[in-house]
Amino acid sequence: MKLRRQGWSRRDVLQLAPATLLGTALNQAACTDKDQATTNSAENRINRVRRFTVTSKRWKVVGKNSHLDVHGDTATDALLIIDTTGGQQGFGWSRSNEGDAAELLDRDPLDFFQPGRGIVSPLGRGDAPLWDLTGKILNEPAWRLLGGYGPEWVPVYDGSIYFSDLQPEYADRGIPRIFEEIDHSLELGHRAFKIKVGRGFKWMAPEPGLVRDIEVVRAIRAHVGPDVKLMVDSNNGYDLATTKRFLKEADIEFFFVEEMFPESVEEDLELKGWIRSRDWNTLVADGESASEPEHFTPYIDRVAFDVLQGDMRRFGFTELRDLARTAAPSGIGLAPHNWGSYLGLYMQLILGRGIPNFVMAEQDPAHTELFDASDFELREGRMRVPDTPGCGLALRTERLADETLDWELHV
């Protein structure tokens, strides 16, 4: 079946009984590890919390999508660093405020870890720093604490193929400029690309915009050949009828189609049925704009999409792991939305090795020397997720002076 060749299928999710038993065993082991760590470090307390705004640099200027103007060449992350009296340090993305962070002070970090449930803390969804810290204290990778269901090598895609052909500085190159960006990413190891469409929503007249969208995706397919995965995302710049016309005239079996129109259960179901009627294996992906997990309930109940795309940073590890559990019996996978973040990629990768129904991680091509990511490796469209305790990244603390300190709390 083509979906299996591409790396993930609904059938994979329906064969999870052994993984569920494994997850139970891992949770029991985590309980034992937690009890032992608590015994050995009864006096370990959180004594310092800092939040920084971290700026990372893209190798290119990312252009427009259907709704927004040029996205630029930088991305920003909210970095929370937690230190303990025992000398451990956990860090990760979190927009938690000073009031919430103050409730961590003088607490045992392991008080917030509940095996089988996750991190329950004043940080709420901004739980990545505590997952990192808990893993380091227990000497376990965070992905194992999340369940350990996923593969060592997690599929990843380049999500940065925007409307470069419409940028004035590339006017003399047009579509070949997009080829340059793709070729660069292919050299880095990517084998999957998400292409923005919807030029006719705002930046061109509707008909010429649609024609250009079709021209671009056809040209990219011809350029990269049949073995590279392609996805499209209109950022709700189409309606259902335009989506069908685009897919029919492009005549490409995309791996998934994302946010093709403002999401609704009925229209997502109609698109799924129309795709199946053409004997395509293309998956329907949606949900990046959701702000609460309850948003997904009717979509999961009726299996209105194939891929759930709750935002990685908005929901965090614990809630996305819970959503994955809810979605798995319906054969729905997770490919969290991630844009405008360096740290978001590595959060997805940890989640991807932790849950059984993870589809692909989205990379924003941002980079910063603040973090050492050398334990991760990109090869042939997949990234190796290491066994390093915590979330796998190392912090170059000497470079923190180059970032903006938002606030600091200490005992």
What positions do the PLM features span?
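Flexible C-terminal active-site loop/helix
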Residues: 18, 44-56, 323, 340-411
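Conserved, mostly hydrophobic/aromatic
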Residues: 87, 139, 257, 299, ...
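N-terminal export leaders
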Residues: 8-26
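Active-site mouth loops of central-metabolism enzymes
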Residues: 155-179, 239, 285
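Metal- or metallocofactor-binding catalytic centers and their adjacent structured scaffolds
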Residues: 48-53, 82-149
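Catalytic core of soluble alpha/beta enzymes
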Residues: 204, 210-339, 344
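C-terminal segment of N-terminal export signals and the immediately downstream linker at the start
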Residues: 27-64
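N-terminal secretory signal peptides
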Residues: 1-8
